[in-house]
Amino acid sequence: MAKSGKKYIQALSKVNKLKSYNIDDAISLLKEIKFVKFDETIDVSVNLNLKKNHTVRETLVLPHQFMKEKRILVFAKGEKAEEAREFGAAYVGDDDLINKIKDGFSDFDVVVATPDMMKDVGKLGPILGKRGLMPNPKTQTITNDLKGTIASLKKGRTEFRANKNGVINFSVGKSSMDSKKIRENYDEFIKELLKRRPSDLKGTFVDSVYVSSTMGPSVKIDFV
């Protein structure tokens, strides 16, 4: 939805575009200029200085959860399938589940697979890849440790990644949350992001950081 209209312009007028705010002041400002009734998401947008060969991607569990519990789909057989069911996966199967997805089933948020299933799961590449849900070792979603993986996903483990333009968009809270909790989620995200600086990168890694709410204007962060 385009950000426009009288209320948006009024909110925008309260943001000093020539100023970089510290994160605490920025969060307070976003709460102050909120003009919609629903509980907005607080988002962080980071512009990175990356080369074409650089990949920045990581998973983390934020200290304060705010999103609804993810619907976990697991590809597994035998004892591993039973393990996935026992620890709370929403959907568990092998060939039957693969065929169901081919037929259009999409009522899930994250996909996990045991290594032995990947040969068959790979056939779903065009479908799962389009949604960014293809199991991947980098996101710890190809694993035999279904108990640990499902537990961490239920706790809110989520992923961030830089797009082709070197931008990461990541949510750190809801406008209704305590400001301190939003700040702590932001700090955890930034801490994990800085660990992913490419080893061969010269110069600045983070060019700029902005925070915004779903419908509100962005606020530049004084990032050092």
Curated annotation (Swiss-Prot):
BP terms from Gene Ontology: regulation of translation; translation
Q: Does the keyword Cell membrane apply?
A: no
Which GO molecular-function terms appear in the entry?
rRNA binding; structural constituent of ribosome; tRNA binding
Which SUPFAM superfamilies does the record associate with it? Ribosomal protein L1
UniProt entry keywords in alphabetical sequence: Repressor, Ribonucleoprotein, Ribosomal protein, RNA-binding, rRNA-binding, Translation regulation, tRNA-binding
NCBIfam families on file: rplA_bact
Q: What's the protein called, per UniProt?
A: Large ribosomal subunit protein uL1
